[in-house]
Amino acid sequence: MDSKDHRNELNRFFKSFVHAGRGIWETARTERNFQFHAAAACAVLICGFLVELSIIEWMIIFLLIGGMFSLELLNTAIEHTVDLITDKHHPLAKAAKDAAAGAVCVFAVISCIIGLLIFLPKL
C-alpha cells in the first residue's frame, strides 16, 4: 500500500466519524425520546458524583448509558428506513417499528432496575 492509498484509507476512516457524529446530532436534535434519555443520563451522572460511585459502578453506568443511546439510534434508523420504504400502514412495517421500540423499552427497564440496585443502598 503506497502513501496515497494510506491517506485515502485514513481519510475515509475519519469521515466515518463525521457521518456518525451527524447521525447522533440529528437524532439528539429531533427525537424526543433520545432527548429524554440524555436528560436522564445527565441526572444519573450528577447523582453518581454525589454518592461517589466506585469505578465498577461507573463502568456499569457508562455501559448502560451507552447501550441506551445506541439502542435509541438503532430504533431511529429502523423507523426512518421503514418510513423510506413505505408511507402506507403495513402490518410488517408496524411490527418492525414496534419491535425496535420494544428493544429500547426492555433495555430502559433493565437499566432502571440496575440503577436502583446501584443507587438505593447509597441513600
Curated annotation (Swiss-Prot):
It catalyses: di-trans,octa-cis-undecaprenol + ATP = di-trans,octa-cis-undecaprenyl phosphate + ADP + H(+). GO terms for biological process: phospholipid biosynthetic process; sporulation resulting in formation of a cellular spore. The chain crosses the membrane at residues 34-51, 58-74, 100-120. Keywords: ATP-binding, Cell membrane, Kinase, Lipid biosynthesis, Lipid metabolism, Membrane, Nucleotide-binding, Phospholipid biosynthesis, Phospholipid metabolism, Sporulation, Transferase, Transmembrane, Transmembrane helix. InterPro entries: DAGK, DAGK_sf, UDPK. It is an enzyme of class 2 (transferase). It comes from the Bacteria. It is a multi-pass membrane protein. One of its GO terms (cellular component) is plasma membrane. Induction: Mainly expressed during the vegetative phase of growth. Pfam families: DAGK_prokar (PF01219). Residues 1-33, 75-99 are cytoplasmic. Disruption phenotype: Cells lacking this gene exhibit an abnormal cortex structure in mutant endospores 6 hours after the onset of sporulation, an indication of cortex degeneration. In addition, they display a significant decrease in the dipicolinic acid content of mutant spores. GO terms for molecular function: ATP binding; di-trans, poly-cis-undecaprenol kinase activity; lipid kinase activity. Catalyzes the phosphorylation of undecaprenol in vitro, which is probably the physiological substrate. Exhibits no detectable activity against other substrates such as monoacylglycerol, ceramide, or diacylglycerol (DAG). Appears indispensable for the maintenance of spore stability and viability in B.subtilis. Belongs to the bacterial diacylglycerol kinase family. This is Undecaprenol kinase. It comes from Bacillus subtilis (strain 168). The lineage of its organism: Bacteria, Bacillati, Bacillota, Bacilli, Bacillales.
